[in-house]
């Protein structure tokens, strides 16, 4: 039972993703239903802080890649469910993920033009959002950039 597992946790960081090679059914089960189940469990267990990895521009249908439409649909609606959940959320929408060492420099928000970000830098960003009040109840794109993670998050508009 998920609620029992997370009882007593300070926060949930949801990073699960179906990957690019699963069908629409797995995408919906993992990226949408899995996210919603953890949101529901968080509320039942009294865990108020919830951070989720989404997808770059998941909030902008006009920018969705046609070949990845089921993925974007799942991320979009998971984001919307989280925003309406009453939880203290942060939605992090990374650009294209790359398997390179972290550089610990990012660009966030409207200034984050389509680009890539290392998986390690996404992880560092997620940890930095945990207690950064400027990220509470916010959703933003993130790519590798010029500012330190702390500076970028503190300056998020």
Predicted regions: what they are:
Residues 1-37, 41-44, 59, 130-131:
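NAD(P)H-binding glycine-rich loop region in Rossmannoid oxidoreductase-like domains
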Residues 16-18, 54, 96:
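Short, small-residue-rich loop/turn micro-motifs
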Residues 2, 9, 44-49, 56-157:
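Oxidoreductase cofactor-interface core, primarily capturing Rossmann-like NAD(P)-dependent enzymes
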């Amino acid at each position: 039972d998920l609620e029992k597992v997370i009882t007593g946790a300070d926060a949930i960081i949801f990073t699960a993703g179906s990957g690019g090679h699963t069908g629409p059914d797995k995408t919906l089960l993992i990226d949408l239903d899995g996210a919603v189940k953890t949101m529901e469990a968080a509320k039942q267990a009294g865990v108020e802080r919830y951070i989720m990895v989404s997808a770059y521009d998941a909030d902008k249908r006009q920018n969705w890649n046609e070949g990845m439409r089921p993925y974007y649909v799942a991320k979009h609606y998971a984001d919307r469910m989280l925003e309406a959940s009453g939880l203290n959320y942060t939605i992090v929408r990374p650009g294209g993920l790359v398997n390179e060492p972290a550089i610990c420099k990012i660009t966030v928000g409207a200034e984050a033009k389509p680009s890539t970000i290392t998986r390690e830098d996404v992880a560092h960003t997620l940890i930095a959002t945990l207690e950064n009040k400027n990220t509470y109840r916010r959703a933003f794109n993130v790519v590798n950039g010029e500012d330190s993670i702390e500076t970028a998050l503190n300056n998020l508009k």
